[in-house]
Amino acid sequence: MHDSDTDLIYSQAHNQVKNFTFDAQVVEVFPDMISRSVPGYKTIIDTIGRLSERFTQDDSNIYDLGCSLGAATLAMRKGITANNCKIIGVDNSIDMVKRCKMHVDAFKGDTPVTIIEGNIQDIDIENASMVVLNFTLQFIEKSQRQALLSKIAQGLKPGGLLVLSEKISSDDNVIDDVLINLHHNFKRDNGYSELEVAQKRSALEKVMLTDSLDVHKERLTQAGFQHVSLWFQCFNFTSLIAIK
């Protein structure tokens, strides 16, 4: 018998694979899905917490845009040493928001947290010392990504930090194929079947549109960030830091 939180969404053949959405079904299995699908996820979350120790400033806001179940939010709240900060988590899935609030409320912390249901493109970024986009930008229309990053840069205080984690594609088709196959093997090693890998890929192909690392770096520079660097990569999963 499987635990209720095991990801079995694509374990049976679907007559028609629907576009992936962060609905109630996904929310139930999200931690399992992420840990078995995203290499290095725990390292990224832990490092976001470490970065919050260094970059959060007194009397400022911290944003977790596309907060899902609040893993990055909780890591930052644990790491923050600055005074009088506030964390604002935003997600457009009502199911995620409901569960995220429960997760956040289950852990005590000195820094107040507000979780909002909303479109991150409509949220004002103000007086921010740290912003996190953890595998979120890839679900935004490509034509709207530059505007979002520019808005974040404008809302950050000098010395403020953006953490941008993204699945990437490579302009080199040979490298792209190698990285994709390594990732699929990672999922197989974590118990996903060929059917699950294929159906999940089909569900994501129209809603998760990846960019190359160079495109991400160019956008961040154009947005106004002075210092941009890749700090993590495993296969085609990456995380960058951008400092204003």
UniProtKB/Swiss-Prot annotation:
CDD domains listed in its UniProt record: AdoMet_MTases
Signal peptide interval: none
Annotated residues for binding of S-adenosyl-L-methionine: 41, 66-68, 91-92, 134, 201
GO biological process, any: tRNA wobble uridine modification
Keyword field contains Zinc: no
Enzyme Commission designation: 2.1.3.-
Family as reported in the entry's similarity comment: Belongs to the class I-like SAM-binding methyltransferase superfamily. Cx-SAM synthase family.
Subunit structure, as described in the record: Homodimer.
Name of the protein in its database record: Carboxy-S-adenosyl-L-methionine synthase
Lineage of producing organism: Bacteria, Pseudomonadati, Pseudomonadota, Gammaproteobacteria, Alteromonadales
Gene: cmoA
